[in-house]
């Protein structure tokens, strides 16, 4: 019972749904996500931990960086994520996707530093 409650709790927050929708496009590191959402890193990390605890996302470490992806190994969780995706319109995600795209372009052009985003200014990003 607690497992299903954790899943629904994780899916009941707009920010977490936005994170899942972004991860639907592929693996992202924390700096990618907080730049896309225009939020501070600790807040995004909290939401990522809730999603991970619910078994909705998985992570992998690459050096000192952590990359997140949707964990689709469980059929029920995958179904719930896809159901949530259907309820989120592209218009709802337009600004997040634009910020993510701009951040990824900037990060690529600045050899991973992403210095355009004030939150991570003067600190290295995930090195992609």
Residue ranges: model-predicted function:
Residues 14, 29, 57, 109-110:
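A general structural signal for well-ordered secondary-structure junctions
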Residues 53-62, 69:
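Beta-hairpin "wing" of winged helix-turn-helix
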């Amino acid at each position: 019972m607690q497992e299903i409650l954790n899943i629904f709790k994780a899916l009941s927050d707009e920010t977490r749904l936005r994170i899942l929708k972004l991860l639907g496009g592929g693996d992202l590191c924390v700096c990618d996500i907080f730049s896309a959402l225009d939020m501070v890193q600790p807040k995004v990390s909290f939401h990522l931990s809730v999603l991970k605890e619910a078994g909705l996302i998985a992570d992998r470490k690459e050096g000192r960086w952590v990359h997140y992806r949707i964990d689709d190994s469980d059929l029920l969780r995958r179904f719930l994520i896809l159901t949530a995706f259907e309820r989120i319109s592209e218009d709802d995600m337009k600004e997040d996707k634009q910020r993510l795209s701009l951040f990824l372009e900037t990060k690529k052009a600045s050899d991973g530093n992403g210095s355009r985003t004030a939150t991570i200014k003067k600190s290295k990003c995930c090195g992609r």
